């Protein structure tokens, strides 16, 4: 079990007059001796980071330099440097709380991503993180995984191989020494919260008294529908309503200082140390949410700003975001009235501190990072299977590829595997999917197939963990859902469309080995596939029938350009694509040639007809799961909302 013994959760009703609170209140996380300022106010330091995404060694190149208001540029990133900066900022500030508004793990640096995010938790424990808000990526596996493995340290399938690994000191993974919260993530419509909605920390005041400081937590609206965190058993509620409800409860219990930590964001200019022209959902919320909230700390958009905004009563309060990937530590200083515990707003300050490299990296944290880098290197090189054929993404004129067929067969296999032990989401009866569909060259987004799997000069090659892990997926789950025969037919028709130049384009879908279909290469877009020419398990497609189809959550939710699938019903989530494809290779033992011929032009008239201009394949992505990194970079360069 983890080290949550320092935190006591109370359930007795009543007001907060001394160190007690109802509901999900917490005991103080630090022993505080500070901190009455010279003016008689009680100083409180709030330190926060956001959207670390497991980038322990350094920020990715695109995020490694940030620019301040005067045009000065800073090289930033890396938790070893952050640990040093945190130690400096905390010095002499005993009433100090270190927290994060989400997306600390489930990122894209290989050691964290591939090793069940356990390296990230060890680093955060060492830095003394006090608590965190659940972001969308904290739900990339399941709510049960977040609570039972990441918080409580309980092992799951593959213990000792894929999880519950020895840390840098040789200790078995024990989970986080901090707790996660969310006020608006609930178990389905009308369900109970999956995490506590808020909590109370305690601030030392004169005369041995302690003042309550409440923290409300919000998860990004729509998390359950995002590609990576697609969760059929989760619902996110309106953010303003949830925050206002919690603020009212805290005030009713005598908490007069309240902070909102929310995993939704905004953009407010390009300088990390100021703010201008704000926009975005967090900004809209900041103007409307309860005036009882004294500070708003945001995340999710991978932006950086610090500014003051008026609450609904016109009083200013800080509105901040601390970038991403370890770029920045935000510091808010609150001064509390020593009698009432209320925040003296006029004295509040906020600063975004760059996580620069002009300090000595913390040696203990450097050891942690180096340990996990070495562990990941050894892990990556482990042989999980062998291959006796090459698998290429290159498309035939009919829109097939050997890599596409391999991946479609994996998806069908994955649909028949049991859910992991922490997954409590609804699972409709019916077993495996009837067929698999995989987008090979979608018009929007990009395929989950990242690279080829090529055979070397030998007749049989080993397949390492890293080769399989990098070949397929970007951390989204496969999902099986019910669609009608009409929807399935329409999705096949949507492979063809006319582009802005009037050219017919073809964005093919790979199908699993139990499917055969032909199309009319001379027909118009929208009328190329006859139901009688689509065979699933040897039987013709019935437009009035119901089929269970497995595909990526990215495709199922319409982000690949096949909107006919969007009316799906009864979804069942499977494991993350990267993890599942590795398991498939290991289960097969040997990858053998996968024949083509699942898709053909009707009557063999491909050359004589107009099959359509194949949508170009995306560039191979050998080092970062796609499409997240590419989409983030594109959004950032255009000033748009990041994909995060």
What are these regions (language model features)?
Residues 19-24:
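C-terminal segment of classical bacterial N-terminal signal peptides
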Residues 4, 8-17, 28-354, 403-410, ...:
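Acidic, metal/ion-coordinating pockets
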Residues 39-87, 91, 125-126, 224-240, ...:
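Catalytic centers of hydrolytic enzymes
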């Amino acid at each position: 079990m983890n080290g949550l013994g320092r935190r006591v959760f109370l359930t007795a009703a009543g007001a907060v007059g001394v160190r007690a609170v109802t509901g999900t209140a917490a005991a103080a996380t630090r022993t505080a001796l500070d901190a009455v300022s010279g003016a008689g106010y009680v100083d409180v330091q709030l330190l926060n980071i956001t959207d670390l995404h497991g980038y322990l060694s350094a920020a990715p190149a695109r995020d490694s330099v940030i620019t301040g208001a005067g045009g000065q540029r800073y090289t930033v990133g890396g938790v070893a440097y952050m640990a040093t900066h945190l130690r400096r900022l905390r010095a002499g500030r005993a009433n100090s709380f270190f927290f994060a508004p989400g997306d600390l793990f489930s990122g894209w640096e290989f050691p964290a991503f591939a090793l069940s995010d356990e390296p990230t938790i060890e680093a955060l424990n060492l830095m003394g993180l006090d608590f965190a808000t659940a972001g969308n990526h904290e739900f990339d596996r399941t709510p049960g995984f977040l609570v039972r493995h990441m918080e409580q340290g309980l092992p799951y399938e593959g213990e000792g191989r894929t999880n519950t690994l020895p840390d840098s000191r040789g200790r078995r993974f024990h989970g986080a020494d901090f707790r996660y919260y969310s006020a608006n993530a609930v178990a389905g419509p009308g369900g109970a919260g999956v995490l506590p909605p808020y909590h109370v920390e305690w601030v030392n005041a004169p005369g041995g008294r302690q003042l309550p400081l409440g923290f409300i937590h919000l998860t990004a609206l729509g998390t359950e529908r995002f590609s990576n965190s697609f969760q059929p058993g989760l619902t996110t509620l309106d953010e303003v309503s949830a925050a206002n409800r919690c603020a009212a409860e805290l005030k009713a219990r005598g908490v007069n200082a309240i902070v909102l930590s929310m995993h939704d964001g905004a953009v407010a200019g390009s300088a990390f140390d100021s703010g201008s022209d704000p926009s975005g959902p967090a900004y809209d919320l900041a103007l409307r949410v309860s005036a009882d909230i004294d500070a708003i700390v945001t995340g999710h958009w991978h932006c950086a700003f610090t500014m003051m905004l008026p609450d609904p009563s016109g009083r200013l309060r800080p509105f901040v975001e601390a970038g991403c990937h370890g770029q920045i530590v935000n510091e808010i200083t609150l001064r509390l009235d020593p009698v009432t515990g209320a925040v003296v707003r006029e004295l509040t300050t906020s600063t975004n501190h760059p996580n620069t490299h002009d300090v000595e990296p913390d040696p203990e944290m450097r050891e942690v990072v180096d340990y996990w880098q070495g562990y990941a290197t050894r892990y990556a090189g482990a042989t999980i299977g062998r291959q006796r054929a090459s698998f290429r993404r290159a498309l035939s004129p009919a829109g097939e590829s050997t890599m596409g067929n391999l991946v479609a067969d994996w998806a069908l296999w994955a649909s028949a595997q049991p859910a992991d032990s922490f997954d409590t989401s609804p699972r409709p009866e019916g077993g495996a999917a009837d067929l698999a569909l995989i987008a090979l060259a979608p018009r929007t987004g990009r395929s989950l197939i990242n690279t080829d799997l090529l055979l070397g000069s030998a007749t049989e090659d080993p397949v390492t963990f890293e080769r399989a892990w990098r070949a397929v997926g970007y951390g989204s789950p496969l999902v099986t859902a019910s669609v009608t025969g009409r929807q399935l037919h329409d999705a096949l028709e949507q492979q063809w469309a006319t582009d802005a130049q009037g050219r017919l384009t073809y964005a093919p879908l790979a199908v699993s080995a139990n499917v055969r279909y032909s199309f009319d290469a001379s027909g118009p877009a929208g009328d190329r596939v006859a139901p009688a020419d689509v065979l699933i398990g040897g039987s013709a497609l019935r437009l009035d029938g119901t089929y269970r189809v497995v595909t990526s959550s990215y495709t199922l939710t319409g982000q690949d350009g096949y909107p006919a699938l969007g009316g799906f019903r009864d979804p069942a989530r499977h494991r993350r694509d990267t993890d599942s494809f590795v398991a498939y290779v290991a289960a097969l033992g040997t990858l053998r040639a996968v024949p083509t011929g699942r898709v053909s032009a009707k009557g063999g008239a491909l050359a004589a007809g107009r099959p359509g201009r194949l949508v170009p394949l995306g560039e191979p992505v050998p080092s970062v799961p796609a499409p997240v990194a590419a989409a983030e970079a594109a959004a950032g360069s255009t000033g748009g909302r990041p994909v995060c």
